[in-house]
C-alpha cells in the first residue's frame, strides 16, 4: 500500500528572522458562494528551512511534514524563484 500523499503549497517568504525557519504566505483564490466574486485570502505557515538558503521575497514550495515544533508542520522542499 502506498504512503498517503502529502500536501504541497506554493508561497512567498515574508520573514526569515528565525534560525532554520521561514514564514511563508500562501495565497488562495476562491469564488464567494453567493455573490460569485473572486475572494483572495492569505495564510501564513512556519516552514523548516534546514540550509537557511530561502530569503525574504523568494517563491518557495513547501511540503507537509511531521510536527517539528509547536508551530512548524511544513518544510521548504525547493526554491522556485529567487528575489531580485
Swiss-Prot record:
Superkingdom assignment: Bacteria
Pfam annotation, one family: Ribosomal_S17
KW Lipid biosynthesis (keyword) present: no
Listed CDD domains: Ribosomal_uS17
GO cellular component terms given for this protein: cytosolic small ribosomal subunit
Keywords, in A-Z order: Ribonucleoprotein, Ribosomal protein, RNA-binding, rRNA-binding
Cited function: One of the primary rRNA binding proteins, it binds specifically to the 5'-end of 16S ribosomal RNA.
Family: Belongs to the universal ribosomal protein uS17 family.
PANTHER family linked to this entry: 40S RIBOSOMAL PROTEIN S11 FAMILY MEMBER, SMALL RIBOSOMAL SUBUNIT PROTEIN US17M
Name the UniProt record assigns to this protein: Small ribosomal subunit protein uS17
Source organism per UniProt: Ureaplasma parvum serovar 3 (strain ATCC 700970)
Source lineage: Bacteria, Bacillati, Mycoplasmatota, Mycoplasmoidales, Mycoplasmoidaceae
Amino acid at each position: 500500500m502506498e504512503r498517503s500523499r502529502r500536501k504541497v503549497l506554493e508561497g512567498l517568504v515574508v520573514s526569515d528572522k528565525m534560525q532554520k525557519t521561514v514564514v511563508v504566505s500562501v495565497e488562495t483564490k476562491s469564488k464567494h458562494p453567493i455573490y460569485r466574486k473572486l475572494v483572495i485570502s492569505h495564510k501564513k505557515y512556519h516552514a523548516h528551512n534546514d540550509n537557511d538558503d530561502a530569503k525574504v521575497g523568494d517563491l518557495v514550495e513547501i511540503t507537509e511534514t511531521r510536527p517539528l515544533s509547536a508551530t512548524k508542520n511544513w518544510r521548504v522542499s525547493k526554491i522556485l524563484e529567487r528575489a531580485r
